[in-house]
Amino acid sequence: MMARPRNHRPSARKSSHSTLVFAVLIMSTFVILILLAFGILSVPSNNAGSSKANDLTSIVRKTLQRSGEDDSKNERWVEIISWEPRASVYHNFLTKEECKYLIELAKPHMEKSTVVDEKTGKSTDSRVRTSSGTFLARGRDKTIREIEKRISDFTFIPVEHGEGLQVLHYEIGQKYEPHYDYFMDEYNTRNGGQRIATVLMYLSDVEEGGETVFPAAKGNYSAVPWWNELSECGKGGLSVKPKMGDALLFWSMTPDATLDPSSLHGGCAVIKGNKWSSTKWLRVHEYKV
């Protein structure tokens, strides 16, 4: 009886499969090297100081390109400073000209700042807020419309959901005690529903003090690069130093639509210089004006 010839097909298939896997690995390695070379992909750092989940020493930064504007102006870039509350700083959000424009527009109409009474919805004087301010109607002029459109583009919240711009001025010693921007009553949510987010734009630099502080923020907030520049009030929580043109976005509600107690915030007293800012509150629904 003649012996059957050996079948070499299995080994050939195995060899072919190994070659395919090897080729895929080579191609994957090549793609990763390209991504690393162009800075699209980055290698995480294993430094002990940045290993904590809430460590702020490594802050996410992304550049947002200007469209149709002068390239000589400072570029905008984003700094995520906290996840509890969710807060980001948009650097160079406003131009110097826009900051000066809002200040000059508001100056003739400044009055002592008030707070909202939760029972009546009316404005009332309070010792917790010692600044002066005024409101600029939504869509009042071309410059304001451009700023409001920019806020909408950055937050993905329609312009129609925003209240009017509030411009505030703090002189030496003036402050705003920690508070929530969201409401705990039904009266103030009749128009537009709850406040979901706040965009706080800094219209001037402040020599000392005047920080926006989040005393209930979670995380190692003492790790921020500007920690040593903060006042004693500013070191009472996660703080942002006012810088002309920057905008602070923070959310008063979590992604599951519950109110976020870590969004508690205040304005530290101005120690040296003066502070100008503009606030845009954003609602869940359309805010009728």
UniProtKB/Swiss-Prot annotation:
EC number: 1.14.11.2
Binding sites annotated in the UniProt record for 2-oxoglutarate: K275
Co-factor note (free text): Binds 1 Fe(2+) ion per subunit.
Top-rank taxon: Eukaryota
Main location: endoplasmic reticulum
Positions with a binding annotation for Fe cation: H179, D181, H265
Membrane topology of the entry: Single-pass type II membrane protein
Glycan-modified residues: N220
GO MF terms held by the record: iron ion binding; L-ascorbic acid binding; procollagen-proline 4-dioxygenase activity
Subcellular localization, as worded in the UniProt entry: Endoplasmic reticulum membrane
Keywords tagged on the record: Dioxygenase, Endoplasmic reticulum, Glycoprotein, Iron, Membrane, Metal-binding, Oxidoreductase, Signal-anchor, Transmembrane, Transmembrane helix
GO CC annotations, alphabetized: endoplasmic reticulum membrane; Golgi cis cisterna
Entries under InterPro entries matching the protein: Oxoglu/Fe-dep_dioxygenase_dom (IPR005123), P4HA-like (IPR045054), Pro_4_hyd_alph (IPR006620), Pro_4_hyd_alph_FE2OG_OXY (IPR044862)
Pfam families membership: 2OG-FeII_Oxy_3
Lumenal-side positions: 41-289
Fe2OG dioxygenase domain span: 161-284
Family: Belongs to the P4HA family.
Functional summary from the UniProt entry: Catalyzes the post-translational formation of 4-hydroxyproline in -Xaa-Pro-Gly- sequences in proline-rich peptide sequences of plant glycoproteins and other proteins. Hydroxyprolines are important constituent of many plant cell wall glycoproteins such as extensins, hydroxyproline-rich glycoproteins, lectins and arabinogalactan proteins.
Name of the protein in its database record: Probable prolyl 4-hydroxylase 10
Native source species: Arabidopsis thaliana (Mouse-ear cress)
Gene: P4H10
